């Protein structure tokens, strides 16, 4: 069964995801952003991963149309880090439901990058059981470039710099995460 759990405020996303997972009855969970398109090739890749029984979960590379040059540059940096460190992007996280519950789900204290923390937790859980967490690359998830179009390169770079210099303080305070929470739509 497929269930959707809408939320009133974007700051509730991690709460909505955890609430949805708590109500889910399946062996696997799939979290996908509303502004993303799960294409048939990617869905087939996910189903193969589930059937092979060798993975605790996965994320996917992303594809965004219409990025400015600086947005494409930042996007390629993220893509490289995602593949290298096996970090799922928040737009798509797939995992075993028992693993999700055992690691505590999405971190309730983080307003951004909770998918990275979850990726790390799932990798550790999987290692203990001989399972891997992978990033699928053959059929990227189509997702929106909306945030890149709403903010200047300077604003996005400043946001990234705040996260790098003061990660805990920034990621735990919505006021420090203007690109996600200042209300621009």
Predicted regions and their residues:
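A recurrent flexible, glycine/aromatic-enriched loop bordering the glycosyltransferase active site
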Residues: 2, 57, 61-66, 78-98
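Short, small-residue-biased leader/transition segments that mark boundaries at the very start
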Residues: 3-10
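Short, conserved alpha-helix that lines the donor NDP-sugar binding/gating region
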Residues: 13-22
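Short aromatic/hydrophobic "clamp" motif used to bind/position activated sugar donors
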Residues: 29
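The conserved acidic donor/metal-binding loop of glycosyltransferases
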Residues: 33-37
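Conserved donor NDP-sugar-binding/catalytic core segment of glycosyltransferases
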Residues: 40-70
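A short, conserved alpha-helix in the catalytic core of glycosyltransferases
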Residues: 99-104, 109-130
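Hydrophobic helical membrane-anchoring modules
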Residues: 124-185
